[in-house]
A protein has these predicted regions:
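Bacterial extracytoplasmic/cell-wall-associated proteins, especially those involved in peptidoglycan
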Residues: 1-157
Length: 157
């Protein structure tokens, strides 16, 4: 039996579309999996990263994925790139919804996470050097960033 035996996209799509009031196609689930693949540090974090992006889609927010920008640019994005890439459909800071195509070939764990995200109220995450910090509100997110930067700064002294 292969790992893919339990990857029933059709069943997952029906569940996701009900849970998040979306009208996703199987291809869009794979697009989501590709974004998760590039954003998550560990397999354990993938369902939580998925929940962030699905929660944002549900609430008609921008995905704001750095990974989609990096895919389009072929390198890490800068703040300047954000303002100059306003017509790029891979700029999920400027375009709502998913990218037109996958941004990589997602692995099994990312596909599973895209099919069955964690049930959270997370809308934000920050990646430190070794972990994700998830937040429910923008204020919590800003505090998490500040805390992470303070820890990194203290560890360099």
């Amino acid at each position: 039996e292969t790992e893919t035996a339990d990857l029933n996209l059709d069943a997952a799509r029906i569940t996701l579309n009900k849970r998040y009031n979306l009208n996703l196609t199987n291809e869009q689930i794979i697009i989501m999996a590709s974004i998760i693949e590039r954003e998550a540090l560990t397999d354990d974090d993938r369902p939580k990263v998925a929940s962030v992006f699905y929660n944002r889609l549900y609430d008609d927010m921008y995905l704001q994925s750095d990974a989609t920008l990096a895919y389009s640019l072929g390198r890490e994005a800068t703040a300047e790139d954000l303002s100059s890439m306003t017509s790029d459909p891979y700029n999920t800071y400027a375009f709502k919804g998913l990218t037109p195509t996958p941004i990589c070939s997602p692995g099994y764990a990312s596909i599973k996470a895209a099919m069955d995200p964690a049930a959270t109220n997370y809308y934000y995450f920050w990646i430190t050097s070794d972990e994700h910090v998830f937040s429910e509100t923008y204020e919590e997110h800003q505090q998490a960033i500040e805390n992470a930067r303070e820890r990194e700064s203290a560890s360099k002294q």
